[in-house]
């Protein structure tokens, strides 16, 4: 490239200064690159005329920023301006005079081009066939610069509500000249692209804010010479702050020219900010081999970084990576450099905060050594370090690097990796996430905290020495992850703690989605506000997973100790975990073994959690199914149940049996319990209706004369059913209306009538709930013979509607409905012993039966219930006793008492998912009742009674019957 000295005549300089000052003050447009054309002679690129040449052909530059604008083109502030081309702060940055503000402020402006701290330049023929740079020029003035580095004189660049788009990539112009009398023209291109929007080689503080957009930033370590600097008190410091803004990649090529093979899309050319994938850099940091370390800190808040971040470091010139002998004894004893190790190390610390997002790769190019004499390690190598002898055995992974690259994501920020990213440390905090798909990520350590996530998708690969999943964070490997020859997650140690989750949701027969030597499921030493110690979770979902690693938990069962807690192994019921251990023996020559290896495949205490729930599946699908196998008879690990899971009709939990863990069958699920309890609950409603009809007939034989009539009764009750399999609580409320008449027949007086009953039931147990509706039609009769023997009989038809709902163990709502029809009968016989004119004692016996026929139905969770013929018989022997108090011809009060033995015979079972399950309710019980009937007039009376029945599978805690009748 040619050196090009910018010489201007006094009149031109004065004019330029005046125009620049005026344009900046009035927010105008201006160009930094122009072409001065002599229309007679042709431009000769290799011998271009000097700027200011009268009648010359030359490219002219007018874009320097000075502290004192009388010296040049621009002052230090742009507001509302539009700039086309390159802005150079070279003379501003090299003016170290006292009270000189080394600062450039750009607000509310558009820079079509770039800002550089270097001398501006361009190429008229950038590359040859081999890609080598060819002809070009750089531009400078007569201004004197200080060539010494002044540490602390940091250039501040403030960019607010401004776009710097790196989109001025070339000066296009037409050169006119005479060929004889003929005027000819050539189209020329002067390539001025910087590759990024901001290109600085001075210590810099860059502040980008207020919806700004910058197409790339490149910071390099420029001149560090100052003969007065002889101590280690100096570092080259760069700071970038991006708030509410976007930094994208730039371009080294002319994107709107077909010369570089670029094509448009419907007339729209590419833009420098269009991220083209790995290799398209948005930020680069390049340290030189000076004596001083380069420290770079980048902070983004609510901002977007679209492009790669490249970090290049080499050894300081005073550091010896191989070591040397400092005292002449023939033994290497020092690496030189500064005493403070950190001053021998370049740094790039990139922090994304407040919902910021980065799409791109971390490009990492540093030097490293394992020959450490008087420096401490500062990084790990993804490979290994070896013995310095003929054996060359693996001894370590610790190295000393010339630079370290650390990435932190905070408060809901996101990094979508591309290409192959390498960093030293990666911390992901407070709901942030890293997504690795079709790319690779390597970091010495990866730490996730406070609900953050690392998602490894299709063709994503993550490599680290130690992965820590803390405080409800998640590392997820999903079915979309493509398995190849490499493991998609490789970590020497994985620690999952405090509710963190290693989530391996892969295809059922993927055996090694990740590889590790040690999987540690542990917990913190502090209990939550409920007194629980929250542990780490290893969740394999439905995978048939083989863990070729040691499973470790350092907790104890002793709740009085600070390390109380269990590791959690989670899976679905169709999953299976085989724990093989890492296969190591106590081999002290290997880094990953020696004293830290547990030898046995699993140690510690674990809870096993079954996460799925379903109504489908027979008992044989789940009962005693092996879900964990520890392939080590010496293992002392314990496994116990973390929960119960609804699987088919039953709940199941984990149970350890030796070195296996199986599904242990427990009680019915809430939804199965409700489904199987419905026939019994229907019977309870019908029994209340049967008792209501029975009360009507009993009352017709006592008190004032009853010639038949119309009656209406409320009935209700509460039931508790428990046969050892089903269990429920039921409330019933209903009403019956009837009409009957008295008929004198042969040797008996008859009451013949009909009734209709309507009832609602509410059955529940735990989360199970059934809403019941019942409609019943009755015909009934009673014959009272002259010898005081009586016989009561009834026939009925009932229809039951039942709507079922429940919540499964995984929180899923389930519902279903079923209808059934039933026929019933009742037969009662007894003898009235008269005690004087008013009292009576009536021994009796009765038998009743209800025969239900239900339909097949399926719940929303796929549990299938076959239609059931449910038969229920009740046998009762008892005695009634009462006394009538007559107050007048039309008024009387009859209180009465009932005591009976009841036997329910309901030996039934129902098919659920193909399994026969007992849902019959039977057994002996005692009935105790009290009641009264009061006649207000000859024709109008009221009655009430209450009963308790208990002792069988179904206890009737109470029932009540309140009614009125009108006698003909």
UniProtKB/Swiss-Prot annotation:
Keyword entries, A-Z: Signal
GO cellular component: outer membrane
Pfam families, A to Z: Autotransporter (PF03797), Pertactin (PF03212)
Leader sequence residues: 1-27
Domain Autotransporter: 703-968
UniProt-listed NCBIfam families: autotrans_barl
Name the UniProt record assigns to this protein: Putative uncharacterized protein YaiT
Provenance organism: Escherichia coli (strain K12)
């Amino acid at each position: 490239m040619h050196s090009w000295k910018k010489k201007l005549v006094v009149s031109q300089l004065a004019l330029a200064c005046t125009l620049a000052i005026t344009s900046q003050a009035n927010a105008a447009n201006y160009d930094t690159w122009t072409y001065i054309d002599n229309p007679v002679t042709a431009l000769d690129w290799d011998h271009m005329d000097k700027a200011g040449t009268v009648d010359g052909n030359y490219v002219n530059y007018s874009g320097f920023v000075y502290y004192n604008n009388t010296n040049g083109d621009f002052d230090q502030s742009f507001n509302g301006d539009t700039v086309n081309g390159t802005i150079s702060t070279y003379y501003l940055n090299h003016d170290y005079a006292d009270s000189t503000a080394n600062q450039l402020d750009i607000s509310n402006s558009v820079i079509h081009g770039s800002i550089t701290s270097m001398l501006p330049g361009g190429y008229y023929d950038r590359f040859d066939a081999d890609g080598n740079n060819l002809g070009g020029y750089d531009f400078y003035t007569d201004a004197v610069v200080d060539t010494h580095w002044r540490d602390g004189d940091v250039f501040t660049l403030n960019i607010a509500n401004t776009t710097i788009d790196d989109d001025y990539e070339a000066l296009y112009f037409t050169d006119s000249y005479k060929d004889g009398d003929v005027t000819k023209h050539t189209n020329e291109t002067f390539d001025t692209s910087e590759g990024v929007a901001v290109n600085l080689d001075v210590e810099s503080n860059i502040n980008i804010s207020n919806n700004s957009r910058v197409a790339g930033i490149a910071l390099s370590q420029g001149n560090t010479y100052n003969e007065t600097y002889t101590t280690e008190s100096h570092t080259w410091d760069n700071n970038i702050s991006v708030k509410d803004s976007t930094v994208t990649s730039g371009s080294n090529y002319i994107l709107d020219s077909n010369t570089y093979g670029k094509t448009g899309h419907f007339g729209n050319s590419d833009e420098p900010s269009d991220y083209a994938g790995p290799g398209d850099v948005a930020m680069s940091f390049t340290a030189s081999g000076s004596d001083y370390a380069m420290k770079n800190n980048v902070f983004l808040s609510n901002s977007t970084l679209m492009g790669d971040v490249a970090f290049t470091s080499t050894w300081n010139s005073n550091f010896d990576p191989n070591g040397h002998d400092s005292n002449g004894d023939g033994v290497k004893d020092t690496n030189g450099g500064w005493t403070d190790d950190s001053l021998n190390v370049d740094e790039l610390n990139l922090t994304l905060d407040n919902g910021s997002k980065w799409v791109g790769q971390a490009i990492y190019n540093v030097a490293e050594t394992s020959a450490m004499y008087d420096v401490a390690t500062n990084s790990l190598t993804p490979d290994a370090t070896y013995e310095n002898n003929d054996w060359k055995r693996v001894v370590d992974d610790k190295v000393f690097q010339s630079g370290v690259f650390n990435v932190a994501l905070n408060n809901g920020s996101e990094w979508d990796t591309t290409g192959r990213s390498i960093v030293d440390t990666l911390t992901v905090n407070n709901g942030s996430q890293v997504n690795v798909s079709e790319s690779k990520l390597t970091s010495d350590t990866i730490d996730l905290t406070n609900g953050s996530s690392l998602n490894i998708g299709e063709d994503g690969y993550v490599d680290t020495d130690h992965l820590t999943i803390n405080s409800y964070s998640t590392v997820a490997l999903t079915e979309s992850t493509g398995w190849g020859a490499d493991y998609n997650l490789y970590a020497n140690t994985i620690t999952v703690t405090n509710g963190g989750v290693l989530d391996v949701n892969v295809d059922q027969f993927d055996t090694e989605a990740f590889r590790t030597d040690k999987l540690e499921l542990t917990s913190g030493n502090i209990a939550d506000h409920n007194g629980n110690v929250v542990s780490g979770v290893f969740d394999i979902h439905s995978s048939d997973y083989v863990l070729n690693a040691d499973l470790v938990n350092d907790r104890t069962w002793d709740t009085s100790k600070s390390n109380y807690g269990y590791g959690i192994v989670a899976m679905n019921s169709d999953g299976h975990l085989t724990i093989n251990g890492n296969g190591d023996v106590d081999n002290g020559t290997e880094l990953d073994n020696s004293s830290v290896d547990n030898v046995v495949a699993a140690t510690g205490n674990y809870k096993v959690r079954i996460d799925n729930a379903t109504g489908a599946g027979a008992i044989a699908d789940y009962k005693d199914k092996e879900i964990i196998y520890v392939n080590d008879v010496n293992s002392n690990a314990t496994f116990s149940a973390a929960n119960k899971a609804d699987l088919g009709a039953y709940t199941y939990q984990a149970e350890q049996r030796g070195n296996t863990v199986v599904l242990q069958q427990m009680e019915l699920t809430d939804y199965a319990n409700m489904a199987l309890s419905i026939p019994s609950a229907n019977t309870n409603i019908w029994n209340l209706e049967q008792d209501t009809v029975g009360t009507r007939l009993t009352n017709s034989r006592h008190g004032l004369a009853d010639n038949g009539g119309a009656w209406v009764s409320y009935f209700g009750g509460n039931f508790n059913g428990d046969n050892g399999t089903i269990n429920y609580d039921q409330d019933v409320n209903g009403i019956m209306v009837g009409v009957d008449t008295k008929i004198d027949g042969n040797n008996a007086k008859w009451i013949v009538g009909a009734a209709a009953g309507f009832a609602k039931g509410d059955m529940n147990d735990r989360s199970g709930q059934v809403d019941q509706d019942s409609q019943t039609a009755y015909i009934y009769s009673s014959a009272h013979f002259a010898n005081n023997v009586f016989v009561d009989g009834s026939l009925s038809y009932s229809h039951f509607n039942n709507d079922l709902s429940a919540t499964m163990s995984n929180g899923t709502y389930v519902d279903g409905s079923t209808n059934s029809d039933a026929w019933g009968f009742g037969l009662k016989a007894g003898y009235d012993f008269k005690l004087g004119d008013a009292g009576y004692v009536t021994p009796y016996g009765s038998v009743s039966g209800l025969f239900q026929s239900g339909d097949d139905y399926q719940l929303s969770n796929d549990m299938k219930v076959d239609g059931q013929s449910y038969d229920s018989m009740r046998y009762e022997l008892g005695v009634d006793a009462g006394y009538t108090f007559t107050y007048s011809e039309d008024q009387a009060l009859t209180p009465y008492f009932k005591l009976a033995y009841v036997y329910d015979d309901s030996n039934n079972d129902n098919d659920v998912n193909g399994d026969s399950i007992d849902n019959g309710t039977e057994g002996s019980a005692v009935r105790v009742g009290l009641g009264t009937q009061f006649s207000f007039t000859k024709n109008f009376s009221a009655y009430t009674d209450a009963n308790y029945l208990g002792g069988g599978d179904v206890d009737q805690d109470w029932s009540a019957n309140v009614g009125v009748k009108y006698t003909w």
